[in-house]
Swiss-Prot record:
Subunit comment: Part of the 30S ribosomal subunit. Forms a bridge to the 50S subunit in the 70S ribosome, contacting the 23S rRNA.
Segments of skewed composition (Basic and acidic residues): 1-19
Descriptive protein name: Small ribosomal subunit protein uS15
Role, per record: One of the primary rRNA binding proteins, it binds directly to 16S rRNA where it helps nucleate assembly of the platform of the 30S subunit by binding and bridging several RNA helices of the 16S rRNA.
Gene: rpsO
SMART domains: Ribosomal_S15
Residue ranges, annotated region (Disordered): 1-22
Keyword entries, A-Z: Ribonucleoprotein, Ribosomal protein, RNA-binding, rRNA-binding
InterPro entries cross-referenced by the UniProt entry: Ribosomal_uS15, Ribosomal_uS15_bac-type, uS15_NS1_RNA-bd_sf
GO cellular component: cytosolic small ribosomal subunit
CDD domains the UniProt entry points to: Ribosomal_S15p_S13e
Signal peptide as annotated in the record: none
């Protein structure tokens, strides 16, 4: 992921100035990386090393989303709607 794209995502999903660690920002960054890796794996079907990394990222994202769901359901709903997750 390019630095400019990462900074754009952080600005877009930050809850306050200088926020880089909130669940919203972390989930947005993970989603971007997951989408990029999905495109890579469509071309390179036998890249099992990257596939494992993808599964690890999906698991981490799921954990962050579960945390957010338990602690603040409104922020959770807003985030999944903005990211287009959970159709």
């Amino acid at each position: 992921m390019e630095k400019a794209r990462k900074e754009q995502l952080i600005r877009e999903y930050a809850t306050h100035e200088g926020d880089t660690g909130s669940p919203e920002v972390q989930v947005a960054l993970l989603t971007e990386r997951i989408n990029h890796l999905n495109e890579h794996l469509k071309e390179h079907k036998k890249d099992h090393h990257s596939r494992r990394g993808l599964l690890m990222m999906v698991g981490k994202r799921r954990g962050l989303l579960n945390y957010l769901k338990e602690h603040d359901i409104e922020r959770y709903r807003s985030l999944i709607k903005r990211l287009g997750l959970r159709k």
